[in-house]
């Protein structure tokens, strides 16, 4: 056998990799693996095997044309002494995507797409005739027409959409959407299909539905909302007994399964909420008009109607298709003001006191106060049953007419928000129980559940060790209920304290992510054995699925195909995460843009994160978060103590600990990368600083003898 034949046979058996004609490279004992490749800006790329084993390092020179997210085949390289295990990409099996977003640079002969971060070792080359009118500085979406291979070293593409000039607010928000493969405009044919829907309520609709048009009904939403998913109705049935209706827009009546509108809704799976806009799941005609439960208009709804006693115990319920007519559209602020002017103190959990001789103040006050009273009973019972208290505040911006942020603040959930929340939770739980809770020996029919697994035990133990540093104790062993009670006790103890936000953040990291599945395991955070999403079909596709299945089962239909619905659940969970990432990026962009107006200014802050490459700090005044890069900590060589969430100086022993108060200056902003850099003015949390400086004989501003500012620094 010729040597070349032998090498070809060895290549077939994965002992060798063919590099080019008559050229081969030796694999490590023929060990070949498949998995995902992740490109890093610092060149320290990683390969994560499909089998879940330890990720491997892939040097830039061994990465071929692989991009982040690509499925690749690698050969595991022989391990060198004192080196981490490495791999070499030998084949790109599947590219994660074929369109990319960046900034155009047009030159004499060719044009280039410059992508944020480190997409590839070189920019994407675009023939000038494929620019679609794009100019230097424009943001554009480019489709790859040629991947690098043995014959072509460059990555080539063509412009499919020019978004517009860099820096324009609409362009930057659309850029974020495009980077995640999310839609930034609605297909014309889908909008045309929506325009043909009349929204007319027919005599057949009236005959088949329960009529709630004579019962007081209202919506309570954010002041700028247009898509009113849900409404509440209330009337007294007798002494100590109330009928409360949770009425949900009947989207599935208008959006038929498999229709062109439905196919687009499946693809999107969720509405997307950026800082200054909503990208709806459904066409505007449906989400803001036909389906939206607007005041003084007859609307079709799918309702869960409860009979509740004064302790909010469910005495009876029914799930029915209805016709409603909202009497009043409230915003949260209006209802909150009404509650407070009638004696409710927000956050205490106490309902309004008994009315005076003239009754409660405000329009429909008696009914709204009764809804609040019942909601507080529901909330109290939920926490008794083991629900976890995580009241995270939302970062908000005031935006001017040009899209520029003028104010940054946190918005806290108040009693009016919690009123709506509790009835939505009750409806979702009840719908899930109506299908999933069956007699022993029977099999429940298919339904998408919203599931939330128990916390990661190792992360809970890390949390326990972390909070000890602040003087808190926490038990991590025991039942689900015991874990929830321990978490709630910790949240109550640190509420309002300087370290409260950081502790809550570390606690959240111990939690698993909620997701959709037909395989029910319950919901740890809410302490529900059965839970689904039924109450927001205008903005979440799983709710539309649930509406259709409930209708099907009410009509005597058989259980739906499990595999089909599990696939849809996985898709919706994935799209929910993608949408959340886009929302987070829009917040980062506006945060950096806002702080760009404060370059050189000093602020009080606290350390909100510690990594090997730097310290994250959150400004106390406006909650904007930036980073102090490790390269700027030039007074010592710092070691990263991951277990204790801190950096410790080797010579001076200065310590930067998660949660420490700190004084920072705004040093740099980079809108393109959404990066905000700070420098440290003083570390108020370091109790060792003065002592160690004296021991080292170093004055303020001086480096310890023999130290170098660049030594050991890691760039971001």
Q: Model segments located where?
A:
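Acidic/polar residues at beta-strand termini and the immediately following turn/coil
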Residues: 49, 115, 309, 400, ...
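Intrinsically disordered, low-complexity linker and terminal regions at domain boundaries
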Residues: 70, 78, 87, 91, ...
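Electropositive polyanion-binding surfaces
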Residues: 141, 146-148, 165, 175, ...
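Non-cytosolic beta-sheet module surface loops
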Residues: 37-39, 104, 607-609, 668-670
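Short beta-strand segments
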Residues: 33, 54-56, 85, 100, ...
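Short, low-complexity cationic-aromatic patches
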Residues: 104-108, 610, 656-658
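Internal insertion modules embedded within essential enzymes
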Residues: 102, 152, 668-680
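Charge-lined substrate channels and their catalytic hotspots, especially those that engage the 3′ end
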Residues: 1-245, 252-297, 329, 336-337, ...
């Amino acid at each position: 056998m010729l040597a070349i034949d032998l090498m070809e046979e060895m290549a077939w058996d994965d002992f060798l990799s063919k590099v080019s004609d008559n050229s081969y490279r030796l694999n490590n004992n023929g060990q070949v693996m498949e998995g995902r490749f992740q490109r890093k800006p610092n060149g320290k790329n990683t390969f994560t095997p499909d089998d879940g084993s330890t990720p491997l390092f892939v040097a830039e020179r061994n990465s071929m044309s692989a991009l982040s997210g690509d499925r690749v085949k690698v050969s595991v390289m022989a391990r060198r002494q004192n080196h981490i295990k490495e791999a070499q990409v030998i084949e790109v099996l599947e590219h994660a995507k074929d369109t990319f977003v960046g900034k155009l640079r047009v030159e004499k002969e060719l044009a280039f797409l410059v992508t944020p971060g480190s997409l590839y070792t070189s920019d994407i080359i675009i023939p000038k005739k494929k620019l679609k009118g794009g100019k230097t500085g424009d943001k554009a979406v480019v489709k790859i027409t040629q991947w690098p291979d043995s014959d072509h070293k460059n990555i080539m593409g063509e412009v499919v959409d020019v978004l517009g000039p860099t820096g324009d607010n609409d362009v930057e928000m659309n850029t974020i959407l495009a980077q995640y493969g999310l839609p930034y405009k609605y297909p014309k044919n889908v909008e045309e299909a929506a325009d043909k829907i009349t929204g007319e309520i027919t005599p057949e609709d009236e005959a088949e539905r329960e009529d709630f048009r004579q019962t007081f009904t209202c919506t309570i939403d954010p002041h700028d909302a247009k898509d009113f998913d849900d409404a509440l109705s209330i009337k007294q049935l007798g002494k100590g007994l109330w009928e409360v209706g949770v009425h949900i827009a009947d989207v599935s009546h208008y959006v038929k399964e498999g229709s062109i509108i439905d196919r687009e809704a499946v693809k999107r799976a969720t509405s997307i909420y950026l800082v200054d806009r909503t990208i709806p799941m459904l066409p505007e005609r449906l989400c803001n008009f036909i389906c939206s439960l607007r005041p003084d208009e007859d609307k079709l709804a799918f309702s869960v109607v409860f009979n509740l006693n004064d302790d909010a115990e469910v005495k009876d319920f029914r799930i029915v298709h209805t016709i409603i007519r909202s009497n009043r559209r409230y915003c949260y602020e209006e209802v909150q003001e009404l509650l407070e002017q009638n004696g409710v103190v927000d956050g205490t959990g106490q309902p309004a006191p008994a009315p005076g001789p003239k009754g409660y103040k405000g329009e429909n006050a008696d009914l709204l106060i009764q809804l609040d009273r019942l909601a507080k009973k529901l909330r109290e019972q939920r926490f008794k049953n083991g629900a976890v208290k995580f009241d995270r505040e939302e970062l908000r911006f005031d935006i001017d007419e040009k899209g520029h942020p003028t104010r940054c603040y946190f918005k806290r959930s108040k009693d009016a928000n919690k009123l709506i929340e509790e009835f939505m939770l009750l409806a979702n739980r009840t719908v899930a129980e109506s299908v999933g809770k069956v007699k022993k020996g029977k099999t429940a029919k298919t339904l998408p559940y919203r599931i939330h697994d128990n916390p990661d035990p190792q992360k809970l133990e890390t949390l326990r060790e972390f909070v000890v540093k602040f003087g808190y104790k926490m038990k991590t062993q025991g039942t689900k209920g015991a874990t929830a009670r321990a978490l709630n006790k910790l949240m109550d103890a640190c509420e309002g304290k300087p370290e409260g936000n950081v502790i809550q953040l570390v606690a959240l990291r111990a939690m698993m992510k909620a997701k959709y599945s037909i395989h029910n395991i319950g919901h740890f955070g809410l302490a529900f054995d059965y839970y689904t999403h039924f109450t927001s079909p205008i903005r979440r596709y799983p709710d539309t699925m649930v509406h259709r299945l409930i209708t099907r089962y009410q009509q005597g239909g058989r259980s739906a195909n499990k595999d089909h619905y599990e696939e849809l659940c996985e898709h919706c969970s994935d799209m929910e995460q993608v949408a959340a990432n886009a929302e987070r990026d829009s917040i980062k962009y506006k945060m950096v843009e806002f702080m760009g107006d404060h370059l050189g200014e000093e602020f009080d802050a606290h350390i909100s994160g510690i990594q090997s490459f730097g310290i994250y700090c959150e400004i106390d005044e406006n909650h904007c978060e930036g980073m102090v890069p490790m390269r700027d900590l030039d007074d010592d060589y710092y070691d990263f103590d991951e277990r204790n969430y801190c950096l410790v100086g080797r010579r001076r022993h200065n310590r930067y600990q998660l949660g420490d108060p700190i004084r920072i200056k705004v040093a740099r902003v980079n809108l393109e990368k959404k990066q905000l850099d700070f420098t440290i003015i003083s570390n108020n949390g370091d109790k060792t600083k003065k002592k160690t400086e004296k021991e080292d004989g170093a004055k303020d501003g001086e480096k310890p003898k023999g130290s170098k500012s660049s030594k050991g620094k890691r760039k971001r």
